[in-house]
C-alpha cells in the first residue's frame, strides 16, 4: 500500500474509492483496526450510491456494510485506489467479515483514554496515518483541549500519540505513560519553532499542525 501523504480518518472519509477498473465504488464510511502493540488498519467500510446500486443488482439489501481489506489498496492519495474490482468486495453478510478482535473506528472514537493509573486523559478524536503506514492516536478533550485552549490553538493543533504508548484497548484505551508525563511531553513539544510560528501567524494560518509526542526518528 502506497500512502502519498500523512492523513487521518477524517480526511479518508472525504476520499472517493476507485476500483481497478477505474469505477467509483463509493466513499469510506468506517474503518476497522486491530491492536497487538501496534495499531493496524485492517478493513474499510464503504457507503455511496455506486455501491448501493451494485448490491441491488445482486439482490442484496443496500443497508448492509460493504468491506474491503487494507491489503486490497494500491494507493492512498486524493483517492483510494484498489487492486481489485467491485465484484470481489464482500459485505457484513459474509460470515466472519469482521473477525473478533477487530474494532470499528466508530466504536474506538467513543472510548475514553486513561493513563497508566487509569486517570482520564481525553478521547481519541482521530487516527493519524504517516507515510510509512504507521497509525497513531489524535487525542482531544480533557487536559489536551484545556492546554490548547489556554494558548489559543485549540483549532490549529492536532496532538498525536503513537501506538507504542498504548498498553491495551478494551472498554477504554489505556496508555503506558502517566498523565504528568504526557503533559510534560506535550508542553515541551508545544515550544518547538513550528508551533511558535502557528501562534505568530494565527490570522493567516489555515492548516492544522500535527504535534507528535514521544516521537522517535525511524
Which functions belong to the PLM regions below?
Residues 1-218:
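Peripheral interaction segments used for macromolecular assembly
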Amino acid at each position: 500500500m502506497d500512502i502519498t501523504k500523512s492523513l487521518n480518518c477524517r480526511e479518508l472519509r472525504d476520499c472517493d474509492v476507485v476500483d481497478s477498473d477505474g469505477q467509483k465504488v463509493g466513499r469510506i464510511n468506517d474503518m476497522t483496526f486491530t491492536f497487538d502493540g501496534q495499531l493496524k488498519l485492517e478493513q474499510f467500510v464503504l457507503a455511496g450510491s455506486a455501491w448501493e446500486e451494485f448490491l441491488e443488482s445482486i439482490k442484496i439489501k443496500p443497508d448492509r456494510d460493504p468491506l474491503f481489506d487494507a491489503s486490497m489498496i494500491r494507493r492512498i492519495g486524493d483517492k483510494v485506489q484498489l487492486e481489485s474490482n467491485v465484484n470481489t468486495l464482500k459485505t457484513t453478510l459474509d460470515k466472519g467479515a469482521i473477525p473478533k478482535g477487530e474494532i470499528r473506528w466508530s466504536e474506538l472514537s467513543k472510548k475514553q483514554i486513561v493513563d497508566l493509573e487509569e486517570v482520564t486523559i481525553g478521547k481519541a478524536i482521530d487516527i493519524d496515518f504517516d507515510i510509512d503506514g504507521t497509525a497513531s492516536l489524535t487525542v482531544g478533550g480533557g487536559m489536551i483541549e484545556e492546554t490548547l485552549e489556554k494558548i489559543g490553538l485549540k483549532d490549529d493543533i492536532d496532538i498525536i500519540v503513537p501506538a507504542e504508548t498504548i498498553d491495551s484497548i478494551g472498554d477504554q484505551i489505556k496508555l503506558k505513560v502517566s498523565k504528568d508525563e504526557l503533559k510534560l511531553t506535550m508542553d515541551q513539544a508545544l515550544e518547538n519553532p513550528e508551533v511558535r510560528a502557528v501562534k505568530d501567524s494565527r490570522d493567516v494560518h489555515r492548516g492544522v499542525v500535527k504535534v507528535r509526542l514521544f516521537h522517535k526518528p525511524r
